[in-house]
Amino acid sequence: MVLLDKLWDDIVAGPQPERGLGMLRKVPQPLNLKDEGESSKITMPTTPTTPVTPTTPISARKDNVWRSVFHPGSNLSSKTMGNQVFDSPQPNSPTVYDWMYSGETRSKHHR
């Protein structure tokens, strides 16, 4: 509790309430806020505004380039292709084994 008392003194810098919100200091009279029409009649002249520079038009919403990486099924451009292209190999495509041990890519250090 000593730490809380010190924090209260350092931060609030006032007397600590005994207990609960009812013990907090009451405002003796309510604040009297003037209506907007009752405020001071002195007005300041407005400052001239600078001309607005034309901005580039807002472009259409761009597709998220990472969408196809993290959510492959939600890529709008490849959604209709499905597994015909990506999940099944082409009939004439070489396997990894074929590629690694073919004559062109085979290591020259092995027989």
From Swiss-Prot:
<feature type="compositionally biased region" description="Polar residues">
    <location>
        <begin position="74"/>
        <end position="95"/>
    </location>
</feature>
<keyword id="KW-0927">Auxin signaling pathway</keyword>
<dbReference type="Pfam" id="PF05564">
    <property type="entry name" value="Auxin_repressed"/>
</dbReference>
<protein>
    <recommendedName>
        <fullName>Auxin-repressed 12.5 kDa protein</fullName>
    </recommendedName>
</protein>
<dbReference type="InterPro" id="IPR008406">
    <property type="entry name" value="DRM/ARP"/>
</dbReference>
<comment type="similarity">
    <text>Belongs to the DRM1/ARP family.</text>
</comment>
<feature type="compositionally biased region" description="Low complexity">
    <location>
        <begin position="43"/>
        <end position="57"/>
    </location>
</feature>
<feature type="region of interest" description="Disordered">
    <location>
        <begin position="18"/>
        <end position="111"/>
    </location>
</feature>
<dbReference type="GO" id="GO:0009734">
    <property type="term" value="P:auxin-activated signaling pathway"/>
</dbReference>
